[in-house]
Amino acid sequence: MRRLALLSTAVVVVCVTGLMVMTSAISTSSSSEEPTVYPVLPAPGEMDAKRHIFVSGHSLTPRPMLEFMSQISAAVEMPIVWNSQNLNGSSIKDRSFGRDESRAWSGFDTGTDANGETIDALAEMQSSSKADAGKYDILLITEQHRLLDSLLWQQTETYLRAYQERFIQSNPEGEVFFFTPWISLSDKNNASDWIEYERAAMPVWQCVVAKVNDQPLNQGHAHPIRIVPASLALADLVGHLIANPSTSGFANESPRKIVDTFFEDDVHLTAAGNYFIAALTFQAIYGELKADDIPSSLADDKARTLRKLAADFLARYRTDNPTFDSKACGDGPSLSFIFKYTSYIERTYARPEKGYVAANVKRFRDMLRFMRQL
């Protein structure tokens, strides 16, 4: 069995090496036109008057996170009003076009709202059920977390644009923020592979949004979609706390304890994880918090540290990534990212289910499919 596993690995490596030689230009753009440059995040204060938020998401944008965000907003005297279309495990396509091909666009009728009741997302965006809240100013939307699988099978670019167009029909001045989802941890005892993956995935998510922004609207005008870099921020948080064991509120915690502090399982968040993402999302949209004494159900030192680390991350992110565009994106994901993505998926999902050899056969088939079709 060990010999067969080694042979399987060798076959994958040889084939991948050949593919890299044959497709070295895969990430080179075929267009000579200069792409439009988009701001990653709003300028501080730009969104202050836009506080009515509609969220289209799944279990990574749960009610506890949004309630924390609402509590933070009230504490800094910038109260938000929100509602959501939440459908666990869903893609943007599921929440718009729908899963039933015979009922086009029935996906807008799926999912539950902030109260756990069924929702008609189109009707809600057109006329909010929140009393005296007015039109929704902001759409916060996320995708399934398996990035390349979502691009291929769920047509992220197509349905992100479709959802944006439906949203701005109800408010032409509405703003859209794409919330980057994080993938499952491959090993909770060693988060380094997950952190490395999320760092590699972030530029690909940016390319997805840039390409959507580059597409012409069917009608009218829309503000460019911005990005809430939740996945990268979460990876940065875990990496920072592991590397800095004296951090206030998290002192002397083991790497596994830090991971368990934020993750209920291998992907869903605890209260501390949701609080960090709430602080990150609020500050990504509205800028750094202007108050430090913010009540929370978390211990004060933990909550204060999480808010500060979210702010510090965003300050670095604004400096390092003030804008994004599709110039470096090419016609599809780079072969190096396809290799990294399929390796991570094989190790995290396929191998525990199928075994080493079958998982690597699947990985090679997936690599070919992504290279040909993305």
List PLM regions with ranges.
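Conserved catalytic region of serine esterases and O-acyltransferases that act on ester linkages
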Residues: 251-374
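Signal peptide processing junction and immediate N-terminal pro/mature segment
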Residues: 20-33
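Alpha-helical cap/lid subdomain in secreted, periplasmic
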Residues: 124-267, 271
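N-terminal signal-anchor transmembrane helix specifying type II single-pass membrane topology
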Residues: 2-23
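Structured segments of extracytoplasmic/periplasmic soluble domains
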Residues: 63, 68-76, 142, 166-170, ...
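Conserved SGNH/GDSL esterase-like catalytic core that processes O-acyl groups on lipids
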Residues: 63-157
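N-terminal module-boundary/linker segments of secreted carbohydrate-active enzymes
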Residues: 30-75
